[in-house]
Amino acid sequence: MEQVVIVDAIRTPMSRSKGGAFRNVRAEDLSAHLMRSLLARNPALEAAALDDIYWGCVQQTLEQGFNIARNAALLAEVPHSVPAVTVNRLCGSSMQALHDAARMIMSGDAQACLVGGVEHMGHVPMSHGVDFHPGLSRNVAKAAGMMGLTAEMLARMHGISREMQDAFAARSHARAWAATQSGAFKNEIIPTGGHDADGVLKQFNYDEVIRPETTVEALATLRPAFDPVSGTVTAGTSSALSDGAAAMLVMSESRAHELGLKPRARVRSMAVVGCDPAIMGYGPVPASKLALKKAGLSVSDIGVFEMNEAFAAQILPCIKDLGLIEQIDEKINLNGGAIALGHPLGCSGARISTTLLNLMERKDVQFGLATMCIGLGQGIATVFERV
C-alpha cells in the first residue's frame, strides 16, 4: 500500500464575515488563489499530472454551488483534464477531502491530488436554505440541529462552568495574537487580496478575526447566546464567524521522491465516527481514539493536537475525556483556535491540519493529531507523522 504524504499546506487569512476583508471576494476566488499558489510553490509537479481535486464546502449554493471545486479549478486555469469534486461532511468537509484523496492514493488509483476547502459565511450564511425534516425529532432531540444548545448540553453533562469557558476563549485569542505577532502563521498564510475598512484594495497576510483585547473580565459581561435563562455559552465562547480557505498538496511518497519534492508529513491514520446528535461536539473523543488505535498509538504519543474550537463548552469536555486537561498549554491548540480565528465550515479541517503541520515542525515532534466535531453527531480525526 502506498504511503500518503503532505508535500505542502497553505491557507488564506481568516476574514471577518460581517464587513470583513473578503466582503467583495467570492469563495471560488479564494479557492482558486490557493490552488494556483500551491502549484506555483511546487513547480516540479505539473498541474496536468494531478489526478483529482477534492474540495470541502458545506453550503453548496449561490457562489458555492454547482461543484465549487470544479469552478475554482477552472478559474485557477488548472488543465481541463484534471477532475474536481466538492465534498460535504459539514464541519469536517475539508478533512474528509483529505481522507478521500488519501484513500485514492493508498489504493493506487491516484498519485497526486489537491485537497482543501472553503466557506464564505458572509456571502452564504450557515442557515441559508436549511429546512430540517419535521419528522427528525422522532429520532433525535429537537434541539440537535441547534449547535449552541448541543454545546450547552455538553457543558452541563461535564461540569464545564461559565468561568472555565471564558478562560479558554480568552486563551484562544491570546495565543492566536501571540502567534500572529511572532510570525508563527507566516509559513501557512498566503497573502490574499481584499478590501480594508475604507474600501482600499490591499493584500492581507494576517487574520483579522482575532481580538487581542479579549479578557476574561470582558467575556464575563456577555449574555448567554442560546439559552437566555440558564445558559453559559456566549458569542464570545463560540467560534467566530469568518471567511477563508485552506489547501494541501497530497501525494504518494514514491511520486514525491520521483519529483524531488520533500514531504512534510505522512498521513498515519484516519477515522470518522458517529455520535448522539444532541452532543455532537463530543465526536472528537471517539474519533481520536479510533484514529490512534488504527495508528497503533496512544494519546501520550501525540506531541501536539489541533482540536477545532466550535465552542469552549464543547472542546473542554473532549480535552478532559482524552486525559489532556493537565496538558492544555503544552499540547492543545498552541496557536489558538476557531474561537479566535473563526470556523469557516468547509475550510476548517484543512486549516487546522495546516496549522498542526507547522506546529509539529516548530515543536520538533513526531506525531500530531487533528480532530473536529461535526454537526448532527459525527467526529473526524487524522494522525500525522513527520517524515
UniProtKB/Swiss-Prot annotation:
GO CC terms of this entry: cytoplasm
InterPro entries from the UniProt entry: FadA, Thiolase, Thiolase-like, Thiolase-like_sf_Thiolase, Thiolase_acyl_enz_int_AS, Thiolase_AS, Thiolase_C, Thiolase_CS
Keywords from the UniProt entry: Acyltransferase, Cytoplasm, Fatty acid metabolism, Lipid degradation, Lipid metabolism, Transferase
GO biological-process terms attached to the record: fatty acid beta-oxidation; phenylacetate catabolic process
Residues of the signal peptide: none
Residues at the active site: C91, H343, C373
Family annotation (Gene3D superfamilies): 3.40.47.10
Catalysed conversion reaction: an acyl-CoA + acetyl-CoA = a 3-oxoacyl-CoA + CoA
Compartment(s) of residence: Cytoplasm
UniProt function note: Catalyzes the final step of fatty acid oxidation in which acetyl-CoA is released and the CoA ester of a fatty acid two carbons shorter is formed.
Complexes and interactors: Heterotetramer of two alpha chains (FadB) and two beta chains (FadA).
Name listed for the protein in its UniProt record: 3-ketoacyl-CoA thiolase
Source species of the chain: Escherichia coli O139:H28 (strain E24377A / ETEC)
Name of the gene encoding the protein in the UniProt record: fadA
